[in-house]
């Protein structure tokens, strides 16, 4: 009986390495009360810090988010948008693929991230970003709302994190008239904290006021906002609404070349970023280039 030698076993084959980077778009909401703003800061809890940490854990490689709006400490968001670049070979093992036919591609990842994130920040949706997409520089406009209550008792406890107590009468007609003077393309230096190398020229596209009982709401939209601009606009207009300033005063502020100290900035917790608009996919790249040129000008 002859013995035949079995051929040696082939060494196990490693899966092929997937080259390149995948850009993901993330739609995000957060309660800004306990955050020191969006941007990562050493020794401070921030929205970007919590999200970066969760994504880095899941993808097992350092990643960093870029957001459409870098909100200040205490400011909330229900419609923040960010993007993150992930190595393509980090995606396959980041989350289970089991799911139902027709489910969105990243639904399992969305569910897994929900277990890694604290209750005051949520990723609402994840999609593959189209070519040319940049969460910050491709954006056409940002929409904010500012809410305050003129009730004599302040704000009901369930809403106190999101509405500013303002138990004084406000003349919304005067505020609306003053707001009209601020519309359009202007240098808003009087309403912006100085940031080295940053322009303060902005296109203010909407600034209007409405009242429902004791709830007063401002809707504010612009191509972009400089640091603290929305709360400064609200603070100045509140001075007009209380008749401490004339309706023409805000127009005069537009002639200033630096930040004004003639009004108080409205409290952060009344402000929420609710939406970011983008152009059609085939215009994303060109919008990106135009915005970079304007912001560096």
Swiss-Prot record:
Protein name according to UniProt: tRNA pseudouridine synthase A
Function recorded in the entry: Formation of pseudouridine at positions 38, 39 and 40 in the anticodon stem and loop of transfer RNAs.
Summary of subunit composition and partner proteins: Homodimer.
The keyword Cell inner membrane belongs to this UniProt entry's keyword annotation: no
SUPFAM superfamilies named in the record: Pseudouridine synthase (SSF55120)
GO annotation (BP), single: tRNA pseudouridine synthesis
Any one GO CC term of the record: peptidoglycan-based cell wall
The enzyme's E.C. designation: 5.4.99.12
Lineage per the UniProt record: Bacteria, Bacillati, Actinomycetota, Actinomycetes, Mycobacteriales
Family annotation (PANTHER family): PSEUDOURIDYLATE SYNTHASE, TRNA PSEUDOURIDINE SYNTHASE-LIKE 1
Residues where substrate binds: 144
Catalytic activity: uridine(38/39/40) in tRNA = pseudouridine(38/39/40) in tRNA
Keywords assigned by UniProt, alphabetized: Isomerase, tRNA processing
Gene name linked to the record: truA
């Amino acid at each position: 009986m002859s013995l035949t030698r079995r051929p040696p076993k082939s060494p196990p084959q490693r899966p092929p390495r997937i080259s390149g980077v995948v850009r993901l778009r993330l739609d995000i909401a957060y309660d800004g009360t306990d955050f020191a703003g969006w941007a990562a800061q050493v020794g401070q809890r921030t929205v970007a810090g919590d999200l970066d940490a969760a994504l880095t854990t899941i993808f097992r490689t350092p990643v960093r988010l870029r957001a459409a709006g870098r909100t200040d400490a205490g400011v909330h968001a229900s419609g923040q948008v960010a993007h993150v670049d992930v190595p393509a070979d980090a995606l396959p093992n980041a989350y289970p693929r089991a799911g139902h036919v027709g489910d969105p591609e990243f639904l399992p990842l969305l569910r897994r991230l929900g277990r890694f994130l604290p209750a005051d920040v949520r990723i609402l949706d994840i999609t593959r970003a189209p070519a040319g997409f940049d969460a910050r520089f491709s954006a056409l406009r940002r929409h904010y709302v500012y809410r305050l209550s003129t009730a004599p008792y302040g704000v009901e406890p369930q809403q106190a994190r999101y509405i500013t107590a303002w138990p004084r009468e406000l003349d919304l007609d005067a505020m609306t008239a003053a707001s009209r003077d601020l519309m359009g393309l202007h240098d808003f230096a009087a309403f912006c904290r100085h940031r080295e190398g940053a322009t303060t020229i902005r296109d203010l596209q909407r600034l209007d006021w409405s009242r429902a009982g004791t709830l007063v709401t401002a809707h504010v939209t612009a191509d972009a906002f400089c640091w603290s601009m929305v709360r400064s606009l609200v603070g100045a207009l509140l001075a007009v609404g209380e008749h401490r300033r004339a309706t023409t005063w805000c127009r005069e502020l537009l002639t200033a070349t630096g930040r004004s100290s003639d009004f108080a900035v409205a409290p952060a917790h009344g402000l929420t970023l609710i939406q970011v608009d983008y152009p059609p996919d085939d215009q994303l790249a060109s919008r990106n280039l135009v915005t970079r040129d304007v912001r560096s000008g």
